[in-house]
């Protein structure tokens, strides 16, 4: 592969709409494959175990994609979030507070709705956690495809909201479904992060230190029994974003420029390929609106996430606790709140954990189908709303441009 071709390919993959398109194509392929006559080959490949057993890394291909490749995406997300917190949209404390408040609303309200509807149903004593998570990769992918004319502050809000949301989901998974956390491995991960932060402070730049250190951090986090993607977010947030005198670009900008094409072109699509294959059947689809588990998931995601994110955000802004993102209206924020209902992969994971061993296994399957259908519905509704808001923003910009021209008509 020639250098000019590599450069052009990298530039192409950095385009948000391209990354979003590849992600959704991979998800569609997985869904078709998992429900085709050769579906056995999909599940056999996804469940194939590979890796050194001695290091407790004899994981399935699907787990490698979810815990390994997705950690790269979370690292890039951490870099973006750190930049916005230090020098960008979230440098204003009240604007930084809004996605945190919104994420809390987006966890609490769905949990209450799911617990209320599913009360007394076997498995729902922990199954209420299924609709609390937002799938950051898919939500940002849909936004990239359908919200290109929305102000960039929309991506910042959704990114920061989804990161906080996923961190809360990871805490819930640790509390509800992890029998014990290996404290020594957790301390090892914290020590690795401390070394990384110290190296950043001392302006050390060699990848010979950072690559092994990042891998060791991921390994310690994994063996501690905590979702290993957390290592990616933590490393991203510890990376320096301000340039020193004489520096052409900061370490965060340099790393994001190099890793973003890998994340968008390889890591996220492969993750989507192995995470999106849900087997559908007419029997399961027929129970979708009658089974209390699926009712809990659908209402929790579609209603709970939207109302929780938007309602708490609206209240915080009205009370002066937080500030609205720049150039965004409440209608924009409502559309973004609908995208928050794309639970997808994290919700599928929680469904597996919460409903494993309950009944004949159909409970987990109906929950997964509910997650899939609801996430697709949220994607379509959110896309339609974003498209309408994009047209409104474009029309407003055109009107503004006309007014600035000589002889333009004032409003």
From Swiss-Prot:
Na(+)/H(+) antiporter that extrudes sodium in exchange for external protons. It catalyses: Na(+)(in) + 2 H(+)(out) = Na(+)(out) + 2 H(+)(in). One of its GO terms (biological process) is regulation of pH. The gene is nhaA2. It is a multi-pass membrane protein. It is found in: Cell membrane. GO terms for molecular function: sodium:proton antiporter activity. The chain crosses the membrane at residues 18-38, 59-79, 97-117, 127-147, 167-187, 218-238, 261-281, 297-317, 338-358, 366-386. Keywords: Antiport, Cell membrane, Ion transport, Membrane, Sodium, Sodium transport, Transmembrane, Transmembrane helix, Transport. Belongs to the NhaA Na(+)/H(+) (TC 2.A.33) antiporter family. Signal peptide: none annotated. Gene3D superfamilies: Na+/H+ antiporter like domain (1.20.1530.10). This is Na(+)/H(+) antiporter NhaA 2. The keyword Nucleotidyltransferase does not apply. HAMAP family: NhaA. It comes from the Bacteria. InterPro entries: Na/H_antiporter_dom_sf (IPR023171), NhaA (IPR004670). Disulfide bonds: none annotated.
């Amino acid at each position: 592969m020639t250098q000019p071709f590599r450069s052009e390919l990298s530039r192409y993959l950095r385009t948000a709409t391209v990354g979003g398109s590849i992600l959704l194509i991979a998800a569609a392929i997985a869904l078709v494959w998992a429900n085709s006559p050769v579906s056995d080959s999909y599940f056999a490949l996804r469940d194939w175990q590979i890796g050194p057993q001695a290091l407790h890394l004899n994981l399935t291909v699907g787990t490698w994609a979810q815990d390994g490749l997705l950690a790269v995406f979370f690292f890039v997300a951490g870099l973006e979030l750190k930049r916005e917190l230090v020098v960008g949209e979230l440098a204003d404390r009240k604007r930084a507070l809004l996605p945190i408040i919104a994420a809390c609303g987006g966890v609490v309200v769905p949990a209450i709705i799911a617990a209320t509807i599913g009360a007394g149903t076997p498995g729902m004593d922990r199954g209420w956690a299924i609709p609390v998570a937002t799938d950051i990769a898919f939500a940002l992918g849909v936004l990239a495809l359908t919200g290109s004319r929305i102000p960039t502050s929309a991506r910042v809000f959704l990114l920061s909201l989804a990161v906080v949301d996923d961190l809360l989901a990871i805490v819930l998974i640790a509390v509800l479904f992890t029998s014990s956390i290996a404290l020594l491995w957790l301390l090892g991960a914290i020590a690795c992060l401390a070394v990384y932060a110290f190296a950043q402070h001392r302006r050390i730049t060699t990848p010979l230190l950072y690559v092994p250190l990042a891998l060791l951090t991921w390994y310690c986090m994994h063996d501690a029994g905590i979702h290993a993607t957390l290592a990616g977010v933590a490393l991203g947030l510890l990376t320096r974003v301000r340039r020193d005198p004489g520096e052409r670009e900061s370490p965060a900008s340099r790393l994001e420029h190099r890793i973003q094409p890998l994340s968008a072109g390889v890591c996220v699509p492969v993750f989507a390929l192995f995470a999106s294959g849900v087997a559908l059947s007419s029997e399961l689809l027929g129970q979708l609106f009658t089974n209390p588990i699926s009712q809990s998931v659908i209402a929790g995601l579609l209603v709970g996430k939207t109302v929780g994110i938007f309602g708490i955000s609206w209240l915080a802004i009205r009370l002066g606790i937080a500030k609205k993102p720049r150039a965004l209206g409440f209608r924009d924020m409502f559309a973004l709140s609908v995208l928050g209902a794309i639970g997808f992969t994290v919700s599928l994971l929680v469904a597996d954990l919460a409903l494993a061993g309950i009944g004949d296994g159909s409970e987990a399957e109906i929950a997964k189908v509910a997650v899939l259908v609801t996430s697709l519905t949220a994607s379509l509704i959110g896309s339609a709303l974003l498209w309408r808001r994009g047209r409104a923003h474009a029309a407003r910009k055109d009107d503004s441009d006309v007014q600035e021209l000589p002889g333009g008509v004032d409003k």
